[in-house]
């Protein structure tokens, strides 16, 4: 019953015009009146922001704010994988024989998430990591590894919330929400970065246009709280032993290691 009511509420309120109205408002000069209260409610760390709070002219500018230089050092170990975002690692697990992952008791299809069965096949029995960004988090997305950009594509339409309620009661938000996907190739290994849009504000902007990315390099940003899903192939990723979900991480912080060479299957 709770699940049905939750989904009904989302369906009644989550329409294209709702998203457009909200996006338009957050970019308007009137939204500036809400910046101070927004920062207070979500406990935004003003000491980290590149600008003073009063210098942001719209809520949108605050959402996509940059940070002071040097506040997010990138782990320097050559084989490390770093967090692409400031977030909470909500779940880590293994992709099943059916190309599925289980998050908060809900099953998600990797094939549906990626929109391509051949691409999904690469990640069979690999590792997935779910990173949730709240509205208070720094919203810019960075590359977790160095690599060649193989492909970038987008899927999905309207979006359910991607917080804990959304993951539990929503209609498979990780595989149905609007999402933009980047696949990287490093030393014979593939990694997928799935950027999942949040309810009402589907905006995911890409800021990297080159064929190669460095670890920690900015690749895009969300316009509101959202989620990143990382997918690794079988036997190529080892989780850092200190990470036990739910676990708060900062962008650039080491979350694990990539194998130096992919094992032969």
Swiss-Prot record:
Heterodimer of a large membrane-associated beta subunit and a small pyruvoyl-containing alpha subunit. InterPro entries: PS_Dcarbxylase (IPR003817), PSD-B (IPR033177), PSD_type1_pro (IPR033178). Catalyzes the formation of phosphatidylethanolamine (PtdEtn) from phosphatidylserine (PtdSer). Is synthesized initially as an inactive proenzyme. Formation of the active enzyme involves a self-maturation process in which the active site pyruvoyl group is generated from an internal serine residue via an autocatalytic post-translational modification. Two non-identical subunits are generated from the proenzyme in this reaction, and the pyruvate is formed at the N-terminus of the alpha chain, which is derived from the carboxyl end of the proenzyme. The keyword Manganese does not apply. It holds the Pfam family PS_Dcarbxylase. It is an enzyme of class 4 (lyase). The keyword Lipid biosynthesis applies. Its main location: membrane. Pathway: Phospholipid metabolism; phosphatidylethanolamine biosynthesis; phosphatidylethanolamine from CDP-diacylglycerol: step 2/2. Binds 1 pyruvoyl group covalently per subunit. Its cofactor is pyruvate. One of its GO terms (biological process) is phosphatidylethanolamine biosynthetic process. The modification Pyruvic acid (Ser) is found at residue 226. It is a peripheral membrane protein. This is Phosphatidylserine decarboxylase proenzyme. Its EC number is 4.1.1.65. One of its GO terms (cellular component) is plasma membrane. It is found in: Cell membrane. It catalyses: a 1,2-diacyl-sn-glycero-3-phospho-L-serine + H(+) = a 1,2-diacyl-sn-glycero-3-phosphoethanolamine + CO2. It comes from Anoxybacillus flavithermus (strain DSM 21510 / WK1). It comes from the Bacteria. Keywords: Cell membrane, Decarboxylase, Lipid biosynthesis, Lipid metabolism, Lyase, Membrane, Phospholipid biosynthesis, Phospholipid metabolism, Pyruvate, Zymogen. Belongs to the phosphatidylserine decarboxylase family. PSD-B subfamily. Prokaryotic type I sub-subfamily. The active site is at 86 (charge relay system), 142 (charge relay system), 226 (charge relay system), 226 (schiff-base intermediate with substrate).
